Regions:
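Bacterial N-terminal signal peptides that target proteins for export
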Residues: 1-8
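Bacterial N-terminal signal peptides
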Residues: 10-19
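A solvent-exposed, acidic/Ser-Thr-rich amphipathic alpha-helical stretch
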Residues: 59-64, 68-107
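Short, solvent-exposed coil/turn segments at beta-strand boundaries
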Residues: 62, 107-111, 132-140
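Short, low-complexity N-terminal intrinsically disordered segments enriched in polar/charged residues
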Residues: 21-52, 56-64, 156-160
Length: 160
């Protein structure tokens, strides 16, 4: 009986979340935005942010693109826009501006996935994948992973 009640409660929660997401999507579409429009705009926001922040080393990009309550899943950086800005200030010390080398970008609703080719200080390459969640034109959540590109590979497929 208890298992049945827990199952029904789980179903009810999923239904409520789905309904809320669907209503939010319907509200955007009523404003004349299609899902394609939203995906394109979210990709543009992430591309602009990434170049300004990581390419141009412009810390004020945080103020323009990152929500104050920013959720950070990278264990080396604390939550919040201010904490992210402080961490980036340390990363950028002595670093030159650069053109961001985007290999792939995709979006699915409020999520944007970006795959980049980066150079390490020694000139070797690094593959970076970032995932951003956006709300109302601001980045509210972030996940990332990085991998050095090995000199040799077990297969003939490039990382980029």
């Amino acid at each position: 009986m208890k298992t049945s009640r827990n199952f029904m409660l789980s179903i009810a929660i999923v239904a409520l979340v789905f309904t809320g997401c669907q209503q939010s999507q319907q509200a955007k579409e009523e404003k004349g935005q299609t899902q394609l429009d939203i995906n394109k705009e979210n990709k543009r926001i992430v591309l602009d942010f990434y170049q300004q922040m990581f390419g141009d080393k412009d810390l004020s990009a945080v103020d323009r693109y990152i929500a104050p309550e920013y959720i950070q899943h990278n264990p080396a950086v604390a939550d919040g826009a201010a904490a992210f800005k402080a961490a980036a200030a340390k990363w950028f010390e002595g670093q030159p501006k650069t053109k961001i080398d985007v290999q792939h970008i995709a979006s699915d609703g409020d999520l944007v996935f970006i795959h980049l080719k980066n150079k390490n200080a020694d000139g070797s390459l690094k593959s970076t994948i970032d995932i951003f969640r956006l709300e109302n034109g601001k980045i509210v959540e972030h996940w990332d992973t990085q991998q050095d590109v090995p000199k040799e590979s077990a297969n003939s497929h490039p990382m980029f």
